[in-house]
Amino acid sequence: LAKNADAPMSPASTTKILTAEIVFRAIVEGRLRLDDSAPISPRAASEGDAESGGSSMFAASGSQVRIDDLLRGLVVASGNDAAIALAERVAGTEEAFAALMNQRARELGMTRSHFANAWGGGGPRQSVTARDMARLAAHVIRTYPQFYPYFGQAEFTWNGVRQQNRNPLLTMAIGADGVKTGHLAQSGFGLVGSAIQNGHRLILVLNGARTEDERAREARRLLEWGFAAEGR
């Protein structure tokens, strides 16, 4: 089922799926380890602090955080600070990481997507399609079974702040196990989600919901319809 699958849309924080993929790949290739640490630069901290209004894992500027914790902060808490810290650790600068993201997107066949940063900030230079994001999600699920469970973690605590995973599907009894939500004022509430029932996996991409509740309702409705169709 597809509607406007190739129409451009803002990925918002679903961008972080690709950020995570690049980190997973670096770990698999031996260029990075989960126990390695990354510094939290002033830039990373400022994009995730309360004043910025962005999502944050609340990593302190100047601190060192393990890659394992940054990944949890990235995909569970949707931390912009985690995304920037990982980008700087892998590529040196955000700009270099964005170039790496676009190279990787092309390698994965995401031909209609373009990324400007690791955390999903708005703007015309940050654009994807639903089809491309579904392709990315399927790749991550298939290629990194050892890392995919990060996306299904229910909560994450850092600096004394406990945050729930924002994926509404995870609390529904429909077999959901990932992937990532996104939201920007100009593009609404979005979700890349996945669930598995009776050995059948479905991947869902939706965007433009007006509220969190609408996003949750539509996501559930579409997955339930999909599984019912699979069973026919």
Describe the predicted segments one by one.
Residues 1-131, 141:
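Active-site-adjacent loops and short helices of periplasmic peptidoglycan-processing enzymes
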Residues 62, 93-232:
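Penicillin-recognizing serine hydrolase domain
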